[in-house]
Amino acid sequence: MDYTQILIKPLVSEKATFVKESSEQVVFFVNPRANKIEIKKAVESVFNVKVAGVNVVTRKPQARTKHGRVTGQTAGYKKAYVTLAPGEKIDFFEGV
């Protein structure tokens, strides 16, 4: 899998911002078929940083019901919490 297909987009939320400030971690939405090794190599090659570790959270699609009937599914996704090596930094929205 190509590195540009692994990282979908960075996650920007209150929790992701808190994690980024408290520990040297960055959160990404990633391709559901990507594994930890591929995610690590993709972040290192795209952002030119050293990665200390990767934790992955997978959310499966949930059935949506309306008036007792199943109407579809919510989207499933995979998030990667990437821990950067000490001294490394990725600036997404600095100064915004």
Swiss-Prot record:
**PROSITE patterns of this UniProt entry?**
RIBOSOMAL_L23
Q: Which GO terms describe its cellular component?
A: ribonucleoprotein complex; ribosome
Keyword 4Fe-4S set for record: no
- What molecular function terms (GO) are annotated for this protein? rRNA binding; structural constituent of ribosome
Keywords linked to the UniProt accession: Ribonucleoprotein, Ribosomal protein, RNA-binding, rRNA-binding
User: One biological-process term from Gene Ontology?
Assistant: translation
Q: What's the superkingdom here?
A: Bacteria
Q: How does it assemble?
A: Part of the 50S ribosomal subunit. Contacts protein L29, and trigger factor when it is bound to the ribosome.
Q: NCBIfam families of this UniProt entry?
A: PRK05738.1-3, PRK05738.2-4
Family per UniProt?
Answer: Belongs to the universal ribosomal protein uL23 family.
Q: What does this protein do?
A: One of the early assembly proteins it binds 23S rRNA. One of the proteins that surrounds the polypeptide exit tunnel on the outside of the ribosome. Forms the main docking site for trigger factor binding to the ribosome.
Protein's recorded name: Large ribosomal subunit protein uL23
Species of origin: Oleidesulfovibrio alaskensis (strain ATCC BAA-1058 / DSM 17464 / G20)
